[in-house]
A protein has these predicted regions:
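Conserved mixed alpha/beta catalytic, RNA-binding, or beta-rich assembly cores of soluble enzyme
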Residues: 2-47, 56-399
Length: 399
């Protein structure tokens, strides 16, 4: 390589920002924070850099909050005095327990049906080896709480030490609601207990609703149907309801942000006006990665990115360098190999689907890939970097 050749590819930077409060001009804060970071740290902004903003500060600036009483009011309006089957929730104090508190406050009785041995994102309620040993078929077997305890005893999550069966039972009862707990993986199993169902799964919710309706359920709603409009002046989310919400206080939740496209466009324009660079902008939540140790799929939000500028539509269109080096140009080396690979990249087609030289690349949505990178960069704790700047993502070996 020549001494003046570029040596760095994609770079992801966490950008520190002020603490965001309701009513803050978030577009101005984000644009200013990124531009000032570039000036202070000595890097340049470029066309097609990606500015990513975590959904949390978007919702905070919007004041998109609701209380458990708001949740209860909507549940009561939709289910009346019926026994409510609450099925397939994830096991999370931050994500679901606070919602369950509101749901229970709006119902007289809940039949809580938990999927096993794991919830949708991989939190366990039973050990897989024990499932095999006990001869249990999770696909077909419906377990009562008593049978579950007989087979598996008290099962606590590895990282939190929480027995979610007991924890969710207490949440419901403390809200003044009667509860029965069963374990099953077939949505139709709930109809043996009630025909009024609130399905709480995230990514499989459309199929679950269809199955329940086809099986004769009288009332079917999902978490995405609760708080799609304000209750008593609360926040709401027209598209996702309670999905993507987080615990804010012991009595309230922060909802997934709404109407984010205008924010993305505003940030894009502010940066263009001040720097002359046309950047891409997206709002991101959970990354779409899975933890190989804890077996947890991180994506508890309904989508990785609820809004983004148009330049982030689509999937990568890349060649696999090692495939080219090991196959097409296996007899070349040094500068000749570099030139041959560079020529292939420059001349590649606009759609490489089915091309052997593209095998092993990542055919996922750009926003899912970049959002996952940003979630890992910003973290979920005290880093103080709710904005992430990704540079060089759309470059390749020839740039």
């Amino acid at each position: 390589m020549a001494n003046n050749e570029r040596r760095v590819g994609t770079v992801s930077r966490g950008i520190r920002c002020p603490i965001i409060r309701q009513g803050d001009d978030l577009a101005e804060i984000v644009a200013t924070s990124v531009i000032e970071a570039a000036e202070i740290e000595g890097f340049s902004l470029n066309d097609r850099d990606v500015i990513s903003v975590t959904e949390s500060i978007v919702a905070r600036s919007q004041g998109n909050y609701a209380t458990i009483d708001d949740i209860a009011a909507d549940v009561k309006a939709k289910f009346g005095n019926e026994t409510v089957g609450v099925i397939f929730p994830i096991l999370s104090r931050n994500r679901f327990a606070i919602c369950l508190k509101g749901i229970a406050k709006g119902a007289k009785k809940i039949v809580l049906m938990l999927s096993y041995p794991q919830d949708e994102v991989g939190n366990s309620l039973a050990d897989l080896d024990m499932i095999d040993k006990m001869g249990v078929n999770p696909y077909s077997d419906v377990l009562s709480l008593e049978k579950y305890r007989e087979l598996f005893g008290v099962y606590r999550l590895e990282f939190t030490g929480v027995d979610y069966v007991e924890y969710y039972k207490n949440v419901i009862e403390e809200a003044g609601c009667e509860v029965e707990i069963v374990f099953a993986n077939q949505a139709k199993a709930i109809l043996d207990y009630t025909d009024c169902v609130l399905t709480c799964d995230i990514h499989t919710r459309a199929r679950t609703k269809r199955i329940l309706k086809e099986a004769g359920a009288k009332i079917v709603f999902g978490l995405d149907d609760i708080l799609t409009s304000p209750q008593n002046g609360s926040g709401c989310n027209e598209n996702y309801g309670l999905l993507g919400s987080n615990k804010s206080t012991e009595e309230s939740i922060k909802l997934f942000p709404r109407e984010c496209k205008d924010l993305c466009l505003s940030i894009q324009k502010k940066v263009l006006d001040r720097t002359g660079k046309c950047v891409e902008v997206m709002v991101y939540g959970d990354g779409a990665f899975k933890d190989p140790r804890g077996k947890i799929w991180e994506l508890a939000d309904p989508v990785v990115s609820p809004a983004f500028t148009d330049g982030l539509i689509g999937t990568p269109n890349e060649l696999k360098l090692k495939y080219l080096a090991d196959n097409d140009f296996k007899d070349l080396s040094g500068e000749a190999l570099k030139e041959a690979i560079s020529k292939s990249i420059r001349e590649k087609g606009g759609n490489l689907v089915g091309n052997m030289a593209a095998q092993g690349t990542t055919p996922r949505q750009l926003t899912d890939l970049i959002g996952s990178l940003c979630d890992l960069t910003s973290g979920s704790g005290d880093k103080g970097t709710p904005v992430v700047l990704v540079q060089g993502y759309f470059d390749n070996y020839t740039n």
